């Protein structure tokens, strides 16, 4: 759980809340009671989750921003999406990426950053840098969660007037269906 306050609020831990799927998962799987990131910084941690490699190997050694082009997920890094896609799975990425440095590659305004307000942080990830993830609905680091924006698979920008976690869950359900 990302918030330790709510970690005990599941049925299998005795809480009265109904969590039948999590309860079944806890019975049938291994429950880890503690986890530690060996690099608890946004971009490097995301790079490790995607690639299974330490930051020094995957290229994401610092938080990704335009002033740090050396910190970005290597194009030749084999990531989980590459592996699953090569095995025939349909792969999606929905939400914040923050593992690729921003460049002047705005699909709607070529030669410009995607954000005039925060060009050093926000990013559009072109298809060749998506590591086997064929369905795309993501952004770099635009943390206005009540009014987020995303780029879809084709590079179209979507400005949303909905809390980002709720919207991303809706997009995930839409993708799965």
Could you describe each region identified by the protein language model?
Residues 1-177:
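Formylglycine-dependent sulfatase
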């Amino acid at each position: 759980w990302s918030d330790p306050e709510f970690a005990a609020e599941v049925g299998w831990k005795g809480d009265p809340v109904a969590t039948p799927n999590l309860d079944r998962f806890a019975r049938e799987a291994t429950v880890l009671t503690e986890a530690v990131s060996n690099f608890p910084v946004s971009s490097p941690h995301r790079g490790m989750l995607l690639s299974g490699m330490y930051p020094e190997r995957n290229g994401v050694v610092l938080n990704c921003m335009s002033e740090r082009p050396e910190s970005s997920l290597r194009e030749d890094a084999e990531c989980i999406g590459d592996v699953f896609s090569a095995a025939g799975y349909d792969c999606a990425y929905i939400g914040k990426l923050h593992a690729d440095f921003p460049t002047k590659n705005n699909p709607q305004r070529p030669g410009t950053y995607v954000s005039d307000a925060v060009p050093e942080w926000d990013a559009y990830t072109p298809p060749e840098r998506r590591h086997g993830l064929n369905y795309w609905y993501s952004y770099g680091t635009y943390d206005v969660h009540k009014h987020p924006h995303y780029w879809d698979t084709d590079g179209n920008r979507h400005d949303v007037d909905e809390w980002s976690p709720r919207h991303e869950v809706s997009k995930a359900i839409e993708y799965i269906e």
